């Protein structure tokens, strides 16, 4: 198999709560946990939650190819949409790329606190794309326990992965239909420039890893539309 730049078989090792991948050369390699962790959560929930349906989009990291081209009719009966494709174990992405994905009441602050999730912002991802295409229910992107995505030092924290699974399961079992209409973001110029912090004056710090992913994904998508 191929994960990242490594070609070959990967052996999985677990020590306490940490999972890493070791290549045939005996060195640590990328697990592909971004976003195998999210896929695992989705498949596990299909075992226990018959009301659930799942969509797996290709090409998220090169411009949200799948979510940009899917039929939105798939979501006509959705109560809400949850994506599990965020590193670490505590981020609840309620705004992505200046697009508001849900209100603060989804789900309740008490439920977020129970599982240790904290509201924060992100950039380009599938739920943001769906929202921009007219998704009219609440959505979010959740941390699911992977760290150092795209690098050979990537690893998974199993405890955080399972915590995300349990969080999503409780949302599915307890939260009702949650309407939320898309509102186009505004980008006011602050001063003589219009960078990320100008668009988000309250944002405490720039997430450069997400910023770079977003920049190169959009460049890649634009390049291949041209040629």
What are these regions (language model features)?
Residues 2-4, 62, 89-91, 147-149:
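Short, acidic Gly/Pro/Ser/Thr-rich loop/turn segments
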């Amino acid at each position: 198999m191929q994960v990242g730049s490594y070609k070959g078989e990967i052996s999985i090792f677990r020590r306490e709560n940490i999972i890493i991948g070791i290549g045939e050369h005996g060195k640590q390699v990328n697990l592909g946990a971004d976003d195998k962790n999210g896929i695992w959560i989705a498949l596990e929930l299909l075992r226990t939650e018959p009301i659930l349906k799942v969509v797996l989009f290709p090409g998220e990291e090169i411009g949200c190819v799948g979510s940009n081209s899917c039929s939105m009719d798939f979501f006509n009966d959705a109560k809400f949409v949850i994506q599990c494709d965020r590193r670490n174990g505590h981020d609840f992405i309620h705004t992505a790329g200046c697009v508001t994905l849900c209100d603060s009441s989804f789900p309740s602050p008490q439920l977020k606190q129970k599982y240790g999730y904290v509201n924060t912002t992100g950039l380009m991802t599938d739920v943001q794309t769906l929202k921009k295409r007219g998704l009219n229910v609440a959505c979010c992107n959740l941390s699911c326990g992977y760290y150092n995505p795209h690098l050979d030092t990537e690893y998974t924290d199993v405890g955080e992965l399972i915590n995300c699974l349990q969080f999503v399961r409780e949302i599915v079992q307890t939260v009702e239909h949650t309407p939320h209409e898309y509102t186009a973001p505004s980008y006011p110029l602050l001063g003589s420039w219009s960078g990320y912090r100008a668009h988000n004056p309250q944002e405490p710090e720039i997430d450069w890893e997400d910023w770079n992913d977003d920049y190169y994904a959009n460049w890649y998508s634009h390049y291949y539309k041209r040629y």
